[in-house]
Amino acid sequence: MKKLIIPFIFISFIWPQDFEPTNMSPIVAYWKTLTPAQKETYLFSYMTQTYETYEELKNELGHTDLTKWYYDNRAELVFGIFDQFKDKDLDEFVGWIDEYYSHEEFVNQPFYEAMAFAFRFQQAAGETIWEK
């Protein structure tokens, strides 16, 4: 009996206990490899691209349902963040995005969701997530 239990215990330590793999978004994997300065550049580039896409939609299509959807679901948040730049630094937004992606349940969420999280917490009073 003892000979049967020892291999079983040994195998249970070798075999991984968590069979559910984490599906990390490629954007999150890329984000985690960047330095803080590179993250600021990436965030600003993402926001600039969103702004330019919205402007192109307005110029090419006018104020259609697609343009309205893009504004409501993507551009409005970016415009709100741009408005915050006169009071807040870009590195504060980067810090909140890092905080968002530090939680395992959010690593498969799109970058837009992390920006929304950063924007909400940036506006709240307090210095840490517990104070907010």
State each model region's role:
Residues 3-16:
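Sec-dependent N-terminal signal peptides
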Residues 19-26, 53-132:
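Compact alpha-helical subdomains of small soluble proteins
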Residues 38, 48-57:
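Charged, low-complexity, helix-prone segments enriched in Lys/Glu/Asp/Gln
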Residues 9-12, 42, 50:
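Residues in flexible loops and secondary-structure boundaries
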Residues 17-44:
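Immediate post-signal-peptide N-terminus of mature secreted/exported proteins
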Residues 2-3, 39:
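Basic side chains
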